[in-house]
Amino acid sequence: MTPNPVTVSVDTSVTKVRSILRDESFRCVPVVSGKHLEGTITRGDMMRISATKSNIEARGIMEHPKVITTPEVDISKIGKQIINADIIQAPVVKSEDDMTIVGIISVADILENLLDKEIKPKKHNVGEATTRNVVTCNYDDPLSKVWDKMDDTGFSGLPVIKKKKIIGMITRKDIINSGHIRLSKEGGVKKPTKVEAIMKTPPVAITEDKDIKEAAKLMIKYNIGRLPVVDHPVHIKKEPERVREAELVGIITREDVLGSYIN
């Protein structure tokens, strides 16, 4: 787990919370009263807040965590709870009777632990854990359209398509960092920003035949939550883990990889 995580108080402004999520690259921030856990705020929560409503406090948008754990709980049990709750991390408190926040444990933390212990996954190759029929966006889509698609589907990252080939990835973090959350819908931007302006390209990608462990290692190395699964990739010579373009087959997430180990 990550001990002593950055927290915000219940009366912290959403503007401050947004800057923390943007500047520190956090996916989630615990909300506390003193050191007592009250709730959490995720990037998804921030995306649902209008850019003009900066006077809202953290208590107004925080949600009760779906999973709360304690330091002594077995890591495999926590992993199953996180997967079943469809989340990527959980706050860690001192005990069931003491809600003092002591850390955060994420899917990435658990995967790193499994790799360090050289535990073998139950599914062996990427193709076995790949999700097909992927939700995508086009390189020339306005960010407002992608924002709506992420909000409607619950996906925090989408492959970017141009001429039927994947050329990049765009995530909630990219949109938050761009400063264009909701602005185009509220008249704050005269000319809508398009996906190609902020997407990450060339994307890190993987093929179906690769080992699940390889996917886990790439996710940890690049601190990414999902990998496009591709066919006929055109690799970057200096960075062979990235592709200039490829045919999109599916996508594999950290949760898919974790499920390959513990389900």
List each model region and its residues.
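Conserved catalytic/dimer-interface elements of ABC ATPase nucleotide-binding domains
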Residues: 30, 39, 91, 159, ...
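Short acidic/polar alpha-helix capping motifs at helix-coil junctions
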Residues: 11, 20-25, 40-45, 88-91, ...
